[in-house]
């Protein structure tokens, strides 16, 4: 591959950021074709039928969905490996990536970040206080309880830095934009993990 890959998306999106961090650690050159979240023209609709970012365009393929993109990049550029080599760990990493993309996306993006940042500042809409209250009192603590049972006290999830670390950590960047920080007294492993991973290059 001689030309940089193109990523259509916004830095605000944790799914875009996941792919950009992945590209950075793979040392794959890329360029951003920026798009405002939730908007897009007819061309974008053709590239992404579900109108979601990121979209990757390279010399072989156009792909949507951050997980599909990262797995494609891993297959095409296997070194340095960002998915564990052990098949059980690799499957577990994919599960954590799926948990992050779905459950954490729902809680940290739709119920927290969108309510605090996107709705008032992009759409000019009021924050739904009922949704936000439930997120802060029930949904987010539930996610953090689960992460606390899965994350290591030191280092990364599977020893070496991997997609699992990236996929989880990107949501805490958006959470910070919304004024949320993990309570280190209640969830010490998660708080330490987030600080370690977000300190890595590319975030």
Residue ranges and their predicted role:
Residues 1-134:
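GST-like domain detector, emphasizing the conserved glutathione-binding G-site
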Residues 3, 100-199:
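GST-like fold's C-terminal all-alpha helical module
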